Amino acid sequence: MKPSELPHRAGVGFKPEHFSAIDAAAQPVGFFEVHAENYMGAGGPPHAKLSKLRQDYALSIHGVGLSIGSMQPLDTDHLARLKIVCDRYEPESFSEHLAWSTHDTTFLNDLLPLPYTEMTLTQVCAHIDQVQTLLDRQMLLENPATYLLFEQSTIEETDFLAEIVRRTGCGLLLDVNNVFVASTNHHMDPRDYLSRFPVEWVREIHLSGHSETVDDAGAPLLIDSHDTAIKDPVWALYEELIARTGPIASLVEWDNDVPEWPVLRAEAEAAGAILRRAADRRAA
């Protein structure tokens, strides 16, 4: 099984509207990430641009539609299309979410949470084994942004993720914004969560912006919206994390209200500066 092996640099999510600016620059970022489902067609401009990009950059393919956390079988047609994409581009990394988005023949346009129980643990592990066997590559599993908790849960999320890694050999994608969003929504301490997270298995980090609102009781409610710059509390958590772990491949996500390329590149440069400082401290 091919391991995940992105460079320990800062990358960004690739947006086709940025292609010309990227093509004119000299290695502006460490790697790019794309959503697998956007490249499941056979050809056309998306593939032409990504093929050109792939000649010069490391690539992470990030899935959003496998429904790893579903209690029903994985969609084998979707899996087959995913394999075609991965075989075509040979990415340095493939990742998916600890979430579900299908029910019978209904496909939901969201990543929904699941209770953490022995039953769901067994099902998620079986699904990951199926994916990794088909792709012959290690999959990274991303911690979710959540807006509710389940009374049925009997396992802490960090323990749930650690046990998945132990059983399947997958790696983890640690989304720092998701940690901050979920911790705020559930009135928990994000630093306590990160202190318990199995960081030794993290092969990629995600950073993104979130939107702020209030719930019906007037309490703060954060939405993992990917439509703004990374907020200061998330940067602070990230810098503390990297000081502890050392450099890890780190991706800036900005999927909605996408800015001009220089704005996105500046976010990646800020992450890259944190990575370099951590590397320098370790080398000293």
UniProtKB/Swiss-Prot annotation:
Membrane-spanning parts: none
InterPro entries: MbnB/TglH/ChrH, Xyl_isomerase-like_sf
Superkingdom: Bacteria
Family label: Belongs to the UPF0276 family.
Name of the featured protein: UPF0276 protein Arad_4857
Classification lineage: Bacteria, Pseudomonadati, Pseudomonadota, Alphaproteobacteria, Hyphomicrobiales
